[in-house]
């Protein structure tokens, strides 16, 4: 069972089906692209993502660009449903994504076409809007979709029990299948 959050969903989608005994995918507020789609392409498909306005680009010496969420906007953008002190720690320790990775088109064989998937995400996610999550879950024929009312992009931080429950449910269904 593979589990991924946010951009990690795009990475997980492109794991080769023959890479091992993968029995399912759990997308935790994650991207599930079709061939040729990128995370940024998907983020713009439906209204509600304000990530582009909240990202701070930092040029690297190799010519690539790291993207950070502006620390002043991190709480409202990424994790509005957790305490401000916790959000400040998360903002200070965030790891960047490269712009190149977020614009990279997905591969030709999405794993969600070959193994079952489950989705959990927040109703108020400002990075990957709930409408987009529903769209991706529908085309992936997700076995179960959980939208958590009032939850942000950091759904696994603010709602760890619900997130863990879905992961355990998915794993137990696959073990008994």
Language-model segment annotations:
Residues 3-4, 8, 12:
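Gly/Ala-rich beta-loop-alpha elbow adjacent to hydrolase catalytic centers
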Residues 17-22, 26-62, 71, 98-102:
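Flexible "cap/lid" loop of the alpha/beta hydrolase fold
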Residues 25, 116-125:
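Conserved strand-to-loop "acid loop" that flanks and positions the catalytic carboxylate
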Residues 69-81:
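Helix-loop "lid/cap" segments that line or gate small-molecule binding pockets
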Residues 92-111, 115:
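Active-site nucleophile elbow and catalytic-triad environment of alpha/beta-hydrolase enzymes
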Residues 112-117, 140-143:
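Short, proline-enriched alpha-helix->beta-strand connector loops that line the catalytic pocket
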Residues 123-151, 157, 169:
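Conserved loop-alpha-helix segment in the C-terminal half of the alpha/beta-hydrolase fold
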Residues 160-168:
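Short, amphipathic alpha-helical "lid/cap" segments that border enzyme active or binding sites
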């Amino acid at each position: 069972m593979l589990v991924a959050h946010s951009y990690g969903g795009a990475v997980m989608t492109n794991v080769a089906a023959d890479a091992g005994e993968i029995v399912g995918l759990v997308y935790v507020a994650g991207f599930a692209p079709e061939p040729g789609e990128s995370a940024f392409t998907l983020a713009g498909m439906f209204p509600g993502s304000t990530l582009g306005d909240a990202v701070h680009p930092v040029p690297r010496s190799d010519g690539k660009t790291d993207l950070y969420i502006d620390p002043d906007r991190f709480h409202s953008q990424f994790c509005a449903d957790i305490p401000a002190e916790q959000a400040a720690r998360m903002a200070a320790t965030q790891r960047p994504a490269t712009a190149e990775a977020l614009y990279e088109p997905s591969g030709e064989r999405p794993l969600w076409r070959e193994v079952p998937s489950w989705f959990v995400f927040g109703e108020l996610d400002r990075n990957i809007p709930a409408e987009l999550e529903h769209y991706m879950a529908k085309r992936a024929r997700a076995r179960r979709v959980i939208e958590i009312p009032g939850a942000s992009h950091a759904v696994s931080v603010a709602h760890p029990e619900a997130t863990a429950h879905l992961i355990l449910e998915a794993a137990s269904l696959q073990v008994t299948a």
